[in-house]
Structures are given as structure tokens and as C-alpha cells.
């Protein structure tokens, strides 16, 4: 019989994976999980189970454990705190050694950290609240194709938020009518128009026709306004090869920016696309379709700030980030927390804003947050104040729903934005005087009135 110090059988995870005296290393990836254990399961066991199942552990002791150094490779639950105001919920902090992850692969990072552990029997619910990505790991990623400053230089637009608009109705228009709507919005004063996330290549409008008519609209609007314009051409497709074919065609048309649905399209496809965009001078707009499936529940899934960090590593120049005002859910402090994580280089830990770890991006380019979803001109003062200059304010129905049509809707948005930026620069309080500022501007602009 075998007796080489190996004992088969099931033992508590906490004996191996709960290490409250562990000192985290600068190279560790740190995770904050919100854990709801099943009744009767101690918090330490639940936290240790998460650390084990998302790193080296399995449900029983195996003899091949002796062939490697568990101490070097195992995840460790190093701290647990009860969630204030919630019964039987804990924040469990887990540290993962860097060697567990493939360099430059968001796909592998998520497969390890959240791949298997969420179906675990000992847990009633589990949510990944935040990740600390060490510079040693973030430096293995290209990050955004261009970033905020390069985008401003490409567009030659400074000192104000950018304006966008999603073309509506999002499905059903022919390519030519779609291009016409794009032209009217850009001609009226917007910087960008956008394909909706589910506009790919449907029977009523194939992608190539849409790309051609949109390119024509962009060039016509640029010639008439003297400003650089763009339309987010959605290149998301059923296969990566098809996606790259569409992006290549967009580049040949001279389009400045393309778009990708990064959660439905997948991180592997997104990172591939981001590398192509940097190599070929294309900006990359990211839509977060499907995010609420993952981040809506408060006690299970993954917080959007984690998806936002992952996107900054995988690559994208814009990403939708909720609005704080409008039709889609978003709490102000939390939203501002992940907006900073997208844009800034160094973000201090701040639990009030949901930031569990200090994050140092070591000069990785920033991502512009896009505010969209049920917003209109009366929200403009609040949006300008909350999001600041480095943002895209995206109005769909708020432009195209104008009683006079698309171009006047775009004019109204642009006038409102310029009025708010000027008022802010003159030192006025947008939060208090916002409505008054818009009313004053409306005296000079029948479209806004």
C-alpha cells in the first residue's frame, strides 16, 4: 500500500486556502468577492472554497499535488469582512499568484477567476466586486488602440465632451435611408453617429451596403461642416474572420472608427480587433450589450467595474458606462468610480465609490466613457458636470425624436452642449442653473426651443 505522506480523502478547504496572515505581493492579482454561503457553511470555508476552486484546488486531495508546489501556485483567501446591513454576506479577498495566468489574455484571466466557481454548491450566491490588476500583468496587454489624447488629436476636437447619436429605428431601415439619417445628424452638429448593437448584417440591410452609404454620409457632412465626423460601423459578426473582413473594408473606405459588442463577441475577438485597430489607425467603440445579464444582480455575477477594467486591458477607445440620469440604471458614486477606472492613470481605493483596491494603470491609455440611454437636452447640464470633457454624450431618441427631424435635433443638442460648456467655463454652477442656461440658449436657437 502507498504510504508516501499522501492521504486520500476530502478535507476542509480552509485548512489549505484560508491564510489570514498572508502578506499580498505587488505581483498578485487581488479579487474581492461578495460571498453568500449556504446556511451552516462558515464564512472562512466559503472564502477558502472560492480561492481553491478558482486556482489549484479540486474537491478531494489528489496524489499529483505532490508533484508541484501548492504554496507557489494556490489562490489564498487572506481577509474576510461581513457586509454591513446584509445578513450572511461577506466580502472575501483572494490573492492569486501571477503565474496562474497567461500573459495578455483577458479570456484566460476570467476563465480562471470566474470560470468554474460560480456554480459551487457551498455558496448560495457569489459576486466578483473588484479586481486589482498589478502592473506586472497589465503591462502584458496592449490596452486601448489609441486612448483619449490620441483620439482628440485625430478628431481635432478639444475642451468639450463629444456628441453622438444612435440611428433609430435601429432595425428595419434600408441602407440608403440609414445613410441619410447619418448625414442629417452629422450635418446638424454631432461628432459621431452609431450603429445600434444589434445592427450587424440582416436581410433588410447588409453590412457592405450600410458601410458604403454611411461613408458617403460622413464625407458629405465633413465637406459641408469643416469638422471631422465619424460613424461607429458595427463590425461584430458570427466569426472572427468575418469580423476582420468587415473591419478591413471599413478601413479601405477611410472610416475613422469601428464598433464591437465585446461581451457577445467575446474577449478573444475583441483583443484581436483592438490590435488591428492600433496597427491600422482605426478608433474602436465598444458596446456592452449583455452586461446586465452579468452585473444586474447585487449579490451574484460580476460588477461592471470588473468588466470595464477587463475592457481597458483587452482594448477599446469608447465604452458605454451608464448615465446616472436617463432610462438605464446607474448609481452616481458607483458610476463615477468606474468612469475614473476607465479614464485615469492611478485610482485610489475608495469604498464609498465601490473601489476596493488602489489601481495603477502605469500609463496604459484611457477609455472614453459613453453616456447613453434615455437622455435628452435637459439632461445636458447634469451630464456635462458629471462626466466632464473626456466623454461621449450619446442621444438616440433625444436627437431623432425632435419634432422637426434629425438635423434640427442634432442642432439642438450641439447648441445645448456649447451653452453648458461656455457657462461652466465662465464659472456658473451647472447643477443649480442648468435649466436657466438651456432656456437662455433657446432664445438664439429655434431648434432648441
Swiss-Prot record:
Family indicated by similarity = Belongs to the RuBisCO large chain family. Type I subfamily.
Protein name (record): Ribulose bisphosphate carboxylase large chain
Q: Record's InterPro entries? A: RuBisCO, RuBisCo_large_chain_AS, RuBisCO_lsu_C, RuBisCO_lsu_C_sf, RuBisCO_lsu_fd_N, RuBisCO_lsu_N_sf, RuBisCO_lsuI
Catalytic reaction(s) noted: 2 (2R)-3-phosphoglycerate + 2 H(+) = D-ribulose 1,5-bisphosphate + CO2 + H2O; D-ribulose 1,5-bisphosphate + O2 = 2-phosphoglycolate + (2R)-3-phosphoglycerate + 2 H(+)
**Residues noted as binding substrate in the record, renumbered to the chain:** 116, 166, 170, 288, 320, 372
What are this entry's molecular-function GO terms? magnesium ion binding; monooxygenase activity; ribulose-bisphosphate carboxylase activity
**Record keyword S-adenosyl-L-methionine present:** no
Please give the residue positions where the record annotates the modification N6,N6,N6-trimethyllysine: 7
EC number(s) for this protein?
4.1.1.39
Catalytic residue list: 168, 287
Q: How is the cofactor bound?
A: Binds 1 Mg(2+) ion per subunit.
Q: Write out the PTM section of this UniProt entry.
A: The disulfide bond which can form in the large chain dimeric partners within the hexadecamer appears to be associated with oxidative stress and protein turnover.
What other facts are recorded? The basic functional RuBisCO is composed of a large chain homodimer in a 'head-to-tail' conformation. In form I RuBisCO this homodimer is arranged in a barrel-like tetramer with the small subunits forming a tetrameric 'cap' on each end of the 'barrel'.
Instruction: For this UniProt record, give its keywords in alphabetical order, as a comma-separated list.
Output: Calvin cycle, Carbon dioxide fixation, Chloroplast, Disulfide bond, Lyase, Magnesium, Metal-binding, Methylation, Monooxygenase, Oxidoreductase, Photorespiration, Photosynthesis, Plastid
Cofactors (names): Mg(2+)
What do we know about how this protein assembles, alone or with others?
Heterohexadecamer of 8 large chains and 8 small chains; disulfide-linked. The disulfide link is formed within the large subunit homodimers.
Amino acid at each position: 500500500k502507498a504510504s508516501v505522506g499522501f492521504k486520500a480523502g476530502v478535507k476542509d478547504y480552509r485548512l489549505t486556502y484560508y491564510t489570514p496572515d498572508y502578506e499580498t505581493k505587488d505581483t498578485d492579482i487581488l479579487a474581492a468577492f461578495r460571498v453568500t454561503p449556504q446556511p451552516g457553511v462558515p464564512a472562512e470555508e466559503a472564502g477558502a472554497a472560492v480561492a481553491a476552486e478558482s486556482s489549484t484546488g479540486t474537491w478531494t486531495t489528489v496524489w499529483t499535488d505532490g508533484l508541484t508546489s501548492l504554496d507557489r501556485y494556490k489562490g489564498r483567501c487572506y481577509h474576510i469582512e461581513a457586509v454591513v446591513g446584509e445578513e450572511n454576506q461577506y466580502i472575501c479577498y483572494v490573492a492569486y499568484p501571477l503565474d496562474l495566468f497567461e500573459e495578455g489574455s483577458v479570456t484566460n484571466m476570467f476563465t480562471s477567476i470566474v470560470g468554474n466557481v460560480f456554480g459551487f454548491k457551498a455558496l448560495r450566491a457569489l459576486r466578483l466586486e473588484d479586481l486589482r490588476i498589478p502592473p506586472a500583468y497589465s503591462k502584458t496587454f496592449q490596452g486601448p488602440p489609441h486612448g483619449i489624447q490620441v483620439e482628440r488629436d485625430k478628431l481635432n476636437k478639444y475642451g468639450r465632451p463629444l456628441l453622438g447619436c444612435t440611428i433609430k429605428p435601429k432595425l428595419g431601415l434600408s441602407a440608403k435611408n440609414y445613410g441619410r439619417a447619418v448625414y442629417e445628424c452629422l450635418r446638424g452638429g454631432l461628432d459621431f453617429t452609431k450603429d445600434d448593437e444589434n445592427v450587424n448584417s440582416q436581410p433588410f440591410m447588409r453590412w457592405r451596403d450600410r458601410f458604403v452609404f454611411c461613408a458617403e454620409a460622413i464625407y458629405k457632412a465633413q465637406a459641408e461642416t469643416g469638422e471631422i465626423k465619424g460613424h461607429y460601423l458595427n463590425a461584430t459578426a458570427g466569426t472572427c474572420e468575418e469580423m476582420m473582413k468587415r473591419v478591413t473594408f471599413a478601413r479601405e473606405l477611410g472610416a475613422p472608427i469601428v464598433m464591437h459588442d465585446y461581451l457577445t463577441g467575446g474577449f478573444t475577438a475583441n483583443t484581436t480587433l483592438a490590435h488591428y485597430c492600433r496597427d491600422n489607425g482605426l478608433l474602436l467603440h465598444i458596446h456592452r450589450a449583455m452586461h446586465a445579464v452579468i452585473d444586474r444582480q447585487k449579490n451574484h455575477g460580476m460588477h461592471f467595474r470588473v468588466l470595464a477594467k477587463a475592457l481597458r486591458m483587452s482594448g477599446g477607445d469608447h465604452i458605454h458606462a451608464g448615465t446616472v440620469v436617463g432610462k438605464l440604471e446607474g448609481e452616481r458614486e458607483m458610476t463615477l468610480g468606474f468612469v475614473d477606472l476607465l479614464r485615469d492613470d492611478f485610482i485610489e481605493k475608495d469604498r464609498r465609490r465601490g473601489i476596493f483596491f488602489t489601481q495603477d494603470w502605469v500609463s496604459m491609455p484611457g477609455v472614453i466613457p459613453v453616456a447613453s440611454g434615455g437622455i435628452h437636452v435637459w439632461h445636458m447640464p447634469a451630464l456635462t458636470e458629471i462626466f466632464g470633457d473626456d466623454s461621449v454624450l450619446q442621444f438616440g431618441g433625444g436627437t431623432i425624436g425632435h419634432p422637426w427631424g434629425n438635423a434640427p435635433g442634432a442642432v439642438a443638442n450641439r447648441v445645448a452642449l456649447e451653452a453648458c460648456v461656455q457657462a461652466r467655463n465662465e464659472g456658473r454652477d451647472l447643477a443649480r442653473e442648468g435649466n436657466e442656461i438651456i432656456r437662455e440658449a433657446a432664445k438664439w436657437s429655434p431648434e432648441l426651443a
